[in-house]
Regions:
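Binding-site signature for planar aromatic cofactors or substrates
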Residues: 1-208
Length: 208
């Protein structure tokens, strides 16, 4: 029989008051068990007309301030986040039968933070940030290939490719984090953390 924590949940939920600490534990375990991209997440956004969209992105950093990913600011998600800063993330790890949902508000990271991450990327990835007009219609693939060639000629020094102003990071400051564990006969286990007005995380159990 699986050990239980103080709330009667599987012991993988531990007994932590801080959901960021629990997220770190689960992410570390996912890195050991997931065959591909344990930091992959679905990001849900919506525009000013409340029409939703969702796509996969990669988490690049997390701490007490939030969860950070990077993108073209003029992409669909970039434009939607400018219109509506409310967003949600979902991590799903099949190898662990676990899921984490996070919702909150989005803000753009500081330029110095974006510069540091951008400069850690490979040359081709940095060129791609310049060459791709993300989410815009392409006439054909040659149009993109030619754009890549142009920017490789412009930035032929692999150590000196500046970050384009239209490319940066977003930080999601969480107001709600839910941890989910698959259960027999769909009797799943769910632990919810909500950030209250006094600045504390409040734990609660949710029905499957």
């Amino acid at each position: 029989m699986n050990q239980k924590n103080s709330l009667g949940l599987n012991n993988c939920f531990l007994d932590l008051d801080d959901p960021i600490e629990l997220f770190k534990v689960w992410m570390d375990e996912a890195k050991k068990s997931e065959p591909n991209d344990p930091n992959a997440l679905s990001l849900a956004t919506s525009n000013k007309n409340n029409i939703p969209s969702v796509r996969m992105v990669l988490l690049k950093e997390f701490n007490q301030k939030g969860f950070v990913f990077y993108t073209n600011l003029n992409s669909q998600k970039g434009n939607e986040l400018k219109e509506n800063p409310n967003a949600a993330m979902c991590f799903h790890w099949k190898s662990l039968l676990r899921q984490i949902r996070i919702s909150g508000t989005i803000t753009q990271v500081e330029d110095s933070v974006a510069d540091q991450y951008y400069n850690s990327r490979g040359y081709d990835s940095r060129i791609g940030a310049w060459a791709s007009k993300q989410s815009k219609e392409l006439k054909n693939r040659d149009e993109l290939s030619n754009s890549i060639k142009e920017f490789k000629q412009k930035f032929d020094d692999i150590n000196n490719v500046p970050r384009p102003k239209h490319w940066s990071g977003w930080n999601l400051t969480p107001t709600r984090i839910e941890f989910w564990l698959d259960g027999d006969s769909r009797i799943h286990e769910r632990l919810n953390y909500t950030f209250d007005k006094s600045g504390n995380w409040i734990k609660s159990l949710l029905s499957p």
